[in-house]
């Protein structure tokens, strides 16, 4: 049956190929039409079509190259371009734009630069179509200096070129350059606004992202779309501003109406969970049709429950996903459920999910460093040090300092001296200048009442010039930030603060609340 189908496809292709001469003479668009109809499985034979068409022109050749690019056959695309040159056909701006785009996708910056040089030689580099393709290549694969030079050389750069350069500046944290270019634009499209909002959000400049979104609304020229709101909501999620986030949610309802897509809902699920409001997070999740929910939707719910101390609900959500959908858990899903089990004390369940990930999912890349670290931490916290040590020995990855810190933390809780000594030696071996490692070691030895080693650690810190960072915390009361520094004697309210601290400590001691902390 399969042989018959393949034979029919070959016969059909030969039929198209045999009539190529006639098609060429009738219409300059006939060859692109022919290329468009070639079956994907037989795309290799398009090269034969390219070679044997007697009156091949730049339009036909560009169409063939474009088809190679569409099929992600970038090597063949560059070979076809070379063949075009050998045949003496002069490439136009669309040929260059297509093949330079191919070099960007295949991450071949050397080829991209060669094509740019050839376009310069032919006087096409200043063309906006070629310039946009070269600029995109340099932004993604080379330096912003090259990209800016290309931008300045482009005649009448379009909004795509400007947006690409702005995105490049933001990714490299060159915010002033990005904003200067953005403000100088005579017209800003929604794509450009989205690039700036998303760029700020992705680089941790969340307040600037939200302010840019507000500026967009204030100008009232461009209407935000379904790509704008995930960027703005993600930014407001990162600063956990519940009131502002609800306002953006209301804006999304106003501007999008029924055009809410899965990306908007997923960002809202994550936002409400980060604000500790799992009820509204679940409402947003339930607004999605079952067939709309993707792995990000489920991961957001699992992680939301886990981070908010509702480990059993996180596990239940994971089980519901496995049972009711055809979605395969990814590494984010597995880490979320392990994190939930770890902090909810569900050790057996955590072990079960970890073993399933190892044995059942047939994906060698599913478990990463963080998954093993989470399991080591889980076993160490529960006092199962032998199993933790065996897990580290059986790891396919080289354990880093994070593993040994997790192990040392568990040793500190359960006073396991032998394993603590092993973890301590590994930590100091891997990073002898890490202050937090020395602090952890000192605390671990103190918990085990090993005062000699505590003294040794402190002496070593002093000899190497390392200083422990002073602990501090802060709270917001009536729009004022109050900062508390460890052992602070300079605060004007220090007497009242320490008096209240003593009362709170006494209350916790009398009611045996320490064990819950």
Curated annotation (Swiss-Prot):
Cellular component per GO, a single term: mitochondrion
Sorted UniProt keywords: Mitochondrion, Repeat, Transit peptide
MF annotations from Gene Ontology: RNA binding
Region (Type E motif), start-end ranges: 403-478
Family matches, as SUPFAM superfamilies: TPR-like (SSF48452)
GO BP terms in the entry: RNA modification
Subcellular location: Mitochondrion
A Pfam family: PPR
First and last residues of every PPR repeat: 57-91, 92-126, 127-157, 158-188, 189-223, 225-259, 261-291, 294-329, 368-398
Family: Belongs to the PPR family. PCMP-E subfamily.
Designated name of the protein: Pentatricopeptide repeat-containing protein At5g42450, mitochondrial
Organism: Arabidopsis thaliana (Mouse-ear cress)
Lineage: Eukaryota, Viridiplantae, Streptophyta, Embryophyta, Tracheophyta
